[in-house]
Amino acid sequence: MPKYRSATTTHGRNMAGARALWRATGVKDEDFGKPIIAVVNSFTQFVPGHVHLKDLGQLVAREIEAAGGIAKEFNTIAVDDGIAMGHGGMLYSLPSRELIADSVEYMVNAHCADAMVCISNCDKITPGMLMASMRLNIPVIFVSGGPMEAGKTKLSDQIIKLDLVDAMIQGADPKVSDEQSEQIERSACPTCGSCSGMFTANSMNCLTEALGLSQPGNGSLLATHADRKQLFISAGQRIVELTKRYYEQDDESALPRNIATKAAFENAMALDIAMGGSTNTVLHLLAAAQEGEVDFDMTDIDRMSRMVPHLCKVAPSTQKYHMEDVHRAGGVVGILGELNRAGLLHNQSKTVLGLTWEEQLAQYDIMLTDSEEVKRFYRAGPAGIRTTQAFSQDCRWDTLDDDRAQGCIRTKENAFSQDGGLAVLKGNIALDGCIVKTAGVDESILKFTGPAVVFESQEDAVEGILGGKVKAGDVVVIRYEGPKGGPGMQEMLYPTTYLKSMGLGKACALLTDGRFSGGTSGLSIGHASPEAANGGAIGLVKQGDLIAIDIPNRTISLQVSEQEMAERRAEQDALGWKPVSRQREVSFALKAYASMATSADKGAVRDKSKLEG
């Protein structure tokens, strides 16, 4: 029977000082001996996805204490990728994931907490907390802040749906008037919550559901909807149950490594491919798997990308559907239900509800259940009122979207594409692979060959695109922007956005050892591994070299002879693998990150071998 970790600080005469300090936080005599559960919040006023979380930690804490635990809340940092985008601030986004994971470990281990409820939402916060959860392997439940409502505005007598990416594209399009650009900007992000499309934040919150670490609706129920309050309440209640199951009944099935097994990671990846999620999720799943010592790597992702069809198309791949529409169609459970019927789900994997996926689908899949309560839950919809308040409205759709032939979620037979929404490409320019979000690629450019236009920073690429240096048919190459070379592996949303603004969204490709925002679409290929700073072949590309991309056959190649490649490599080895003329100030904190960063195919985690010996 495992001993409560917290007993280290609450029992024994030699812990009198620790108990005195616990008492100063409000712990009473009768509380000693109860499990201490960390409420890991991420409230900040910098981020719309987190601005409404201030009081939600205490909502969870009250439920924990009512159920027989001691709740202690702390906050992590949270970077808003959208605000950090397009300038030096983006260098800090991915490294913040490691800081979040470490800070959770520091707080939980320093105070000997027994379990956690992780209140996350946006891009690097959910992954950082997930990494910490797999590392610590104590009972945990994730509950996110929820997605933002889609924006809406009237243009040319037509109501259109909007999101953050629309504001960015219109703002850079010289053909759009100042008045229309401002109208879209003011309408794009109407409420608190994570940006309304299937961008990185919402993708990751959906994946925690598929991993079994969060409750039904976590990934899709709007931040503003009153129903979301129950997710926080039940998380507080359920974590006490999980904690007691492990520590008092020796039930190891309550631990995250026994829930998020390899089968669960494959379920999460299947979901990601089926819904055309952000390419960033590949980085984060690989990183979390390594923390949990789960044997899951790029080979598994490549294999699954060839099996799983594209069942759910959401912004930025279409403007017809946003997260509120996914929820109306049954949410994550709805997509997993279709994967299960297609034989593509490990349905004996378990979840924090204590159910197998087979059992959970029977209860929560709108295509299977007779429960009016469940159907009402999935009819929760937007109010269209600007607000920063959680649980501020109770609007519902009149009907569910259960049209699996032409609706938001499709059956395998009616899939948007039999080819999944993400793909791994390999070739001489990316020996360890690179990632493309095929859900956002127009069919006309699934095969593409063009001359390289090479840039050694995102800033130069933006200047070149807006300055007319990129023409239809070109392959834009942005290198030395990987985890080590950036450092920090910036998102390339501005270059891809400006290609669209210049009318080149379906006429060009972009290849980088950096990464992309979940808001990216188009023929945008990222995570080229090894990265240029680690001697990757993307560092050998010269202006005008032909690059051939073949998504159906999963290949990408630099059309240069092996002899020429070898000569270029010898030359680059002598010069050193670094940008020729880039001027970029890099702080000590970022240099420390770069000194241990691995390439994207390893999840851009720190190279632990550098700590050995």
Curated annotation (Swiss-Prot):
InterPro entries membership: Dihydro-acid_dehy_C (IPR042096), DihydroxyA_deHydtase (IPR004404), DiOHA_6PGluconate_deHydtase_CS (IPR020558), ILV_EDD_C (IPR056740), ILV_EDD_N (IPR000581), IlvD/EDD_N (IPR037237)
Gene3D superfamilies referenced in this protein's UniProt entry, alphabetically: IlvD/EDD C-terminal domain-like
Catalytic activity from the UniProt record: (2R)-2,3-dihydroxy-3-methylbutanoate = 3-methyl-2-oxobutanoate + H2O; (2R,3R)-2,3-dihydroxy-3-methylpentanoate = (S)-3-methyl-2-oxopentanoate + H2O
UniProt binding sites for Mg(2+): D81, D123, K124, E491
Keywords, in A-Z order: 2Fe-2S, Amino-acid biosynthesis, Branched-chain amino acid biosynthesis, Iron, Iron-sulfur, Lyase, Magnesium, Metal-binding
GO process terms (BP): isoleucine biosynthetic process; L-valine biosynthetic process
Name of the top EC class for this enzyme: lyase
Catalytic residue list: S517
Gene Ontology molecular functions: 2 iron, 2 sulfur cluster binding; dihydroxy-acid dehydratase activity; magnesium ion binding
Metabolic or biological pathway: Amino-acid biosynthesis; L-isoleucine biosynthesis; L-isoleucine from 2-oxobutanoate: step 3/4; Amino-acid biosynthesis; L-valine biosynthesis; L-valine from pyruvate: step 3/4
Superkingdom of this protein's organism: Bacteria
GO CC, one annotated term: cytosol
Sequence positions that bind [2Fe-2S] cluster: C122, C195
Cofactor(s) required for function per UniProt: [2Fe-2S] cluster; Mg(2+)
Comment on bound cofactor: Binds 1 [2Fe-2S] cluster per subunit. This cluster acts as a Lewis acid cofactor.
EC code(s) of this entry: 4.2.1.9
Coiled coil residues, start to end: none
Modified residues (N6-carboxylysine): K124
Quaternary structure note: Homodimer.
Purpose of the protein: Functions in the biosynthesis of branched-chain amino acids. Catalyzes the dehydration of (2R,3R)-2,3-dihydroxy-3-methylpentanoate (2,3-dihydroxy-3-methylvalerate) into 2-oxo-3-methylpentanoate (2-oxo-3-methylvalerate) and of (2R)-2,3-dihydroxy-3-methylbutanoate (2,3-dihydroxyisovalerate) into 2-oxo-3-methylbutanoate (2-oxoisovalerate), the penultimate precursor to L-isoleucine and L-valine, respectively.
HAMAP family tied to this protein: IlvD (MF_00012)
Record-stated family: Belongs to the IlvD/Edd family.
Protein name from the UniProt record: Dihydroxy-acid dehydratase
Origin species: Vibrio vulnificus (strain YJ016)
